Amino acid sequence: LRYLRLKFAFRFSSPVKKVLIMGAVIAVLMMVFHQGRYSGTGSNLVALCFDGITDDIYAYDWILKMALTILTLSSGFIGGEVAPLFSIGSCLGYVLGPVFGFDPMFGAALGFASVFCSGSNTLLAAILVGVESFGYSMLPFFSVVCFVSFIFNFNNSIFTAQRVAFTRPTRRQRLKERLSEKKNNINN
């Protein structure tokens, strides 16, 4: 998201021009990919994950929703960052659930909370959203998947102004540390 925002800012001199051109491109893409299935907040996809009909969700739904959401937000359109996380997570969980031996709807519920956790960098909020949406019986499962997704997001968030109470090393910082350690080991 950050990369595309910078790329578009460099590519288009005028923000109005960027929004007009990219809006037209996004509109065409939305119609090409299943006549608008991926437009909006994605609540339609979340509902399809839990309707019990297995043919309604495609294995690529999550990636197309994610790509189009990133493209939309990087083009300068504001709002609608959170609801697509639920949609992306539900679709991904629905697809991965059977791979790990879970019911697709159970996987969709876990994906719902864990992608929100990772995308927003909020551990407790994601667990509570999952519990509020799917019931207290899911608390242990949400706790585990949200903890794992929180650990592996390395303080990244869709919210650029978010402040964190404690910092974890980023992927780049860990790589620098490893390279300096290897360099020191070679020199010694």
Where are these regions (language model features)?
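Alpha-helical transmembrane segments and immediately membrane-proximal extracytoplasmic
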Residues: L1-N188
